[in-house]
Amino acid sequence: MVNNNKGYFLGKNAVVTGAASGIGLALCEELLAQGAGKVVLADINGKNLRAHKERLARQYPGQVKGIRCDVTQENAVKQMIEQGVLFMGGRFDLLINNAGLGLSGTFTQTEATNSPSAKFNLRVQTNEDWEKAFAINFYSALYGCRAAIGVMTPQGGGQVVNIISGIAWSPMAYQSMYAATKAALNMLTLTLRYEYWDEGIKFNSATPGTTLTAIWGKNTPPKGAQTPQESARKILKGVTENQRLILGDKGDEEGAPHCFDPSIAEGLDSYYLNVARVRRSCELIL
């Protein structure tokens, strides 16, 4: 795949969260391949982080730093950004908030009685589960945005990319937590885009599309799922174009324009109701 936007990242410094595996790691690899100056990998998995940092550092000496960070803790995120900025020589051009967790479950105990939960070991979503979901999928990015703005504003600008999901506008049954967190993150991103436009800070929402990562667990990904590397290249192409909403695959491209179209509301109801009934019959859970 030929990328004609390599010059955009030339010499730029970046921080990527959730960077020890999957799409986050692929984003780091692609940034370095496209000429980024220094790249900070942040992740809570110290073992994987260390291994990939050392591997990339051999290929790009002096350009890579790994920082173990629990992104659900605001002070930890702030300190990680501070350490990263020091490593990057004071210039912070790009933050990609990629850390996230895929979550499925039944909304209530009553629902669980007649649901796929027994077959697929789905949990009833407790308040603690909801708090965890928002901590990882939403607040971690919020903390990153705050820390980045504090550095990027005085330096005259920068760019923040928040990784969301097509489920932010696709109401799939048994994924209420995941959908809610990603929808919230999308609107946070888009409102900040205009709030900080005049400060020179660009904000982009990005869906990775259906991608072959550990988020699938024991489930079989749909036919045609792309690799993390393919997803990363599409996301970064959208970053170079400052796209408001970067769509990671054809499914997201086709779904996003129609999700709130009143002229096809009846069709959407039929589609999503069918998905819910299929899942309730234990035929499919993603």
PLM features per residue range, with description:
Residues G46-K47, R68-M80, N127:
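The beta1-alpha1 cofactor-binding region of Rossmann-like NAD(H)/NADP(H)-dependent oxidoreductases
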Residues T106-E131:
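Substrate-binding pocket helix/loop in short-chain dehydrogenase/reductase
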Residues V2-V40:
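Canonical Rossmann dinucleotide-binding motif of NAD(H)/NADP(H)-dependent dehydrogenases/reductases
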Residues A36-H52:
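Conserved glycine-rich Rossmann-like NAD(P)H-binding loop of the short-chain dehydrogenase/reductase
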Residues C145, T181:
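Active-site helix of classical SDR
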Residues M187, R193-E254:
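SDR active-site lid
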